[in-house]
Amino acid sequence: MSNQKKRNFQIEAFKQRVVVDPKYADKTWKILEHAIHEIYNHNASGLSFEELYRNAYNMVLHKYGDKLYTGLVTTMTFHLKEICKSIEEAQGGAFLELLNRKWNDHNKALQMIRDILMYMDRTYVSTTKKTHVHELGLHLWRDNVVYSSKIQTRLLNTLLDLVHKERTGEVIDRVLMRNVIKMFMDLGESVYQDDFEKPFLEASAEFYKVESMEFIESCDCGEYLKKAEKPLVEEVERVVNYLDAKSEAKITSVVEREMIANHVQRLVHMENSGLVNMLLNDKYEDMGRMYSLFRRVANGLVTVRDVMTLHLREMGKQLVTDPEKSKDPVEFVQRLLDERDKYDRIINMAFNNDKTFQNALNSSFEYFVNLNTRSPEFISLFVDDKLRKGLKGVGEEDVDLILDKVMMLFRYLQEKDVFEKYYKQHLAKRLLSGKTVSDDAERNLIVKLKTECGYQFTSKLEGMFTDMKTSHDTLLGFYNSHPELSEGPTLVVQVLTTGSWPTQPTIQCNLPAEVSVLCEKFRSYYLGTHTGRRLSWQTNMGTADIKAVFGKGQKHELNVSTFQMCVLMLFNNSDRLSYKEIEQATEIPTPDLKRCLQSMACVKGKNVLRKEPMSKEIAEEDWFVVNDRFASKFYKVKIGTVVAQKETEPEKQETRQRVEEDRKPQIEAAIVRIMKSRRVLDHNNIIAEVTKQLQTRFLANPTEIKKRIESLIERDFLERDNTDRKLYRYLA
């Protein structure tokens, strides 16, 4: 094996310098320069692009790239200055057309030149970090043509003038506009923005500022909104046709500011045509347009919502505090429902079912519904009217819709316990008189109340229905155990559980003998089948059906109250009775007796008795006889039927007092629950917590809460802190 060292072979560089003929570069450039002239002069068809490419290639290869690049700039600049002169000389409409044609020519020339100088573009330009040929061509066009002192301002003014003409209804060459504005975009984003878009937006702002002032002085609100809507569509169309897509948001913002935002207050409050006028006259289309336009600008919808709320509250306040409109409870509630329906339609059809508008509607209704302290009573009376007669022949879905509307008003009530009080009274009268049109509707409403307020709210109402069912079963048992009673008067007894039904003072009266005997038999039966029970007859709540024969044998069935029955039965044994005699025989209290006689002797069509002397009032000196001339086209005649009417002022005060008494234990229970959980709490937090817990039933009065706290302290449920008297402690 050889131990010789390995040798490294080296190849030395060629030492003899290759010398290129100095005239070569000049000759080659002349060829290329001539070709560029020919291209700009539209004589490129006779050129050999392969040969030209090879010449440019060799110049770069032999280090004459700089000469080639500099020559290109000089030659292109020469031609562009010539082009500029020709464009400057163009008159009128020919100006833009020539500019566009020369721009297209320049682009075609630039493409050919770039193809010829492709090798220079890839090597020399990249190495020396110079501007590439295509971009160079754009810059030279910009600097020598677009920025020419005689073209720049003229070009901008021409374009803006064409836009103005189009805005005022003239037809313009949109294709030409698109091509020229596309030129700005091709020259670079900054060129488009600084040299066209910015002045375009400024001119647009001025145009719409002037136009909006003209419109607002000559149009009503609805007409103005139509005119404001139109340019928003037109400007988007303008962008699509000949502007940069990025300009859409900017020009839209200009129109929104000048046509809408700057006039929001004036438009909304415009006399005889602003938002209030639209609300009053159900102008859904105008309101919908206002909503869609105002949502585009800051605080636009807030303004619309605030004006609607203010109007709604003023209208509602007038509605519920007008004494004339409070005379009929059913009409009072129906007006509330009509207004609610109206604004539901407005919000749905015009305001895009906007939740913030819905919330404003709800808060407004809650505000004015509670301004009238009788709203809970009136809503209950409305239900009473519907469930007595108003829902006859109404489909199940429509019934449910009406009940849902009632529940909507119920939710607005701050004193739901007051509603409960009245509802219980009215339900009791319906059940006892058998005057409800639908048991299903009655139960359906109770289910809705239960869902809304919980079991505690409806437990007594459900107890009333239970009593009605139990009473029916009890009566069947009573008559089954006394078959001998099938002949004679029929007794129908409702056994009411104390606590479930509204408490009423027990008013005793002397029942007719045949009825009294039946009552005693029922008492014996009931107490014999139930242990630990006590029965107390509520004759003032009863009704009776009695058959009567008048002069000439005319027969009728009279539906009367128990008191009226007691009076009428006396005339089976007497032809003529004085007020005093009736009073002694029946022992009906004076106010009730007078009302009873008045309904039978002084009401046309119900006057089964005749009073002597004739007058509208009942006096203790009056005498009464059966009215032999009584006639009615109906066999069954209702006399003095019990209908729910709004309470008198004293009755209202009495109900209010009962409600206040019922609230006391509820407030105390809430305080105890809170303190048991928190152990120690200050006065203000107790007030806040109690109010929050009870708000589903009523709005607790802070003064009453304070009284209940004092009462609980006295009974050792709570104590004050020794160091901080505003703190309370729970005593286990």
Swiss-Prot record:
Sorted UniProt keywords: Isopeptide bond, Ubl conjugation, Ubl conjugation pathway
Pfam families: Cullin (PF00888), Cullin_Nedd8 (PF10557)
Record flagged with keyword Ubl conjugation: yes
Recorded phenotype for the gene knockout or disruption: No visible phenotype. Cul3a and cul3b double mutant is embryonic lethal.
Single annotated GO MF: ubiquitin protein ligase binding
PANTHER family for this protein: CULLIN (PTHR11932)
Protein name: Cullin-3B
